[in-house]
Amino acid sequence: MLRLQMMEGLIVKRTLLLILLLVISVSYALPIEPIIYVNKSTVDYQNAKILMDNFYSSREININGDNVTIVINDIMYIPSIDELEIKNGDKNLIIKFDRDGNKVKYKDIECIEYLNLKKGEEISLFNKSYIVEDITSNYVILKEKDGKEVLTNESFEYDGYKVVVKLVSSDLNTIIVDIYKNEKVLDSPKLTKGKIYYMKGGTLGLMYENCTRIGKGYRFTFRVYSTIKIEEGEDYPLDKEFKVKEISTDKIKLEYKNIDSLGNEIYLFNYTIIPEKCYKDYVLFKVIKRKEKTVDVKDVAYIGDGIYAVKVNNTVHVFYKGKELKNHEKIYLGSVDVYSSNPLNVNKDIILIGGPKVNKIVKELEDKGLLKVNISTNYPGNNRGIILKIKNPYNDNNIYILAGSDRWGTKAAILVFLTKYNDEDTLMVEWDKGEIKIIK
């Protein structure tokens, strides 16, 4: 099986605050690994982020008190012949497919979770910790690790259930409760202090911990847990698109149920999987993985990917490559500062964002008479943009210019480049009340 992971985004600055990014070919004949330049001090940089978000792995920083949450967006390009395999820690996703012209037809999707399924062991599923409460040859019961303490005089709600205390024994060691869901009584179990009860066929674990008399009433302490029962031949409770195929002490094997209902682009767990281009001998898949992680910062914490958090005077600061990041700031991985006297003299195709007024490289091309049209505030016109493809004067590579008479024209050029461009030499586009149109 062929595999290839794309190089992550490369950002380059000149003294003009130009940004360069390393990208990979997309389905409409965009050459492999072009370089993108955009003036960071203009609104074009915000528009260029649309392009960047589609191709480059990123991290978004969110600071809330002592907690730093990282929104992770990883993008990989993986060539496969007839089977796409995505490995992520203890999860292995295997997608078998056939070629159907320029499309793919999915034959089978299997997911294997490698886990230590021994009673009392802690495991992690979907970034949540569970304790293996019970395991047999065909099912396993998992209990949320810590659960939640609940204090109540009579009733409480948790995870879609409502629990109502109905009877209390004279010694306070036993109670009877009614458990509701959607206003219907599902069970009325007897609970003994210190022993956990599991809702049959449900997702609730309940332990009666204590009861205190308060005047003529009572104060009850419960610990409640989200629980899941994973059973062979049944739907997978964490994603009902899958059926449980096999359970053993070291893994859970899942099988996608409705394979014939899938289109070209599919969504599995926290992955988006897109067949980007069908080549003669293989298919290039674009795989986008999204997840979040939160770190409680005590003093200094390494968050990953070169990102550090420091707590100073009860305030958390986040740094990447020596630069302090703002709250909600997004960074593109693999960025470096470069000062180049001739940014066009690189052995790669180049994409330039913005016209000659905002992008000095486009201005240089205009001064040399290399532009096929004169891009200005009057041409191509209000809300209009243009995509130009020209030969690089320093080598045999191409230069693509995405520019407009205003910010909306440039945005239209970027969006068309992403979705509708077919390697034309000149293409005029328009932003029309939120829609993009090709003019000629």
Curated annotation (Swiss-Prot):
Protein's UniProt keywords contain Signal: yes
The organism of origin for this protein: Methanocaldococcus jannaschii (strain ATCC 43067 / DSM 2661 / JAL-1 / JCM 10045 / NBRC 100440)
Signal peptide: 1-29
Name of this protein: Uncharacterized protein MJ0954
Signal among keywords: yes
Swiss-Prot/TrEMBL keywords: Signal
Record-stated family: Belongs to the Mj S-layer protein family.
